[in-house]
Amino acid sequence: MIKGSKICGISDLDTLNFIINHPYPPQFIGFICNYKKSSRYVDIEKLNKLLAIDKNKSNFVAVLVKPDEDILEKIKHLPFDYYQIYDCTPDEIKSIKEKYNKKIITALTIRDENDVQKYHLYSDVTDIYLFDSKGYEKSMAFDHALIEKIKINKPLMIAGNIQVNDNLENYKKIADIIDISGG
């Protein structure tokens, strides 16, 4: 059953204001903090301006690909509720979670069943699992049937070419949260 939504890749104040002040704002709003290849990347100076807004009922999410100490130190004072982390080991995520006292969305990029089964490794360090495609900013899809049968005791979010006009019935059986790209 879908319990929430996330809009990811917000990079301008007008869009952010619209989303936050919408009668049905998303539960999560994501900002791409260190993946410079993305057209939705937001540098620290712009992040400071964007995140000065009243976030209303939404949670702010720092989207981080293999974050290093430099970026983590730069964003630690910003009002992020969650760090969404790609390409880190469970030990690296545990260290980040403990040092920066943030809730963690562990992003697992999915190509096949082997990728799906990696979720077990992160059970002690994640607050939310995100199953995404291998495409990062390319908004590629993955076969959602790969995750239909797994049983996870934490919220499960899916991303990867999910469109606002998709039939949500397709996702209700497998996800608690839908991640829609803001790009």
Predicted region positions:
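Conserved N-terminal beta1-alpha1 strand-loop-helix module at the mouth
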Residues: 1-183
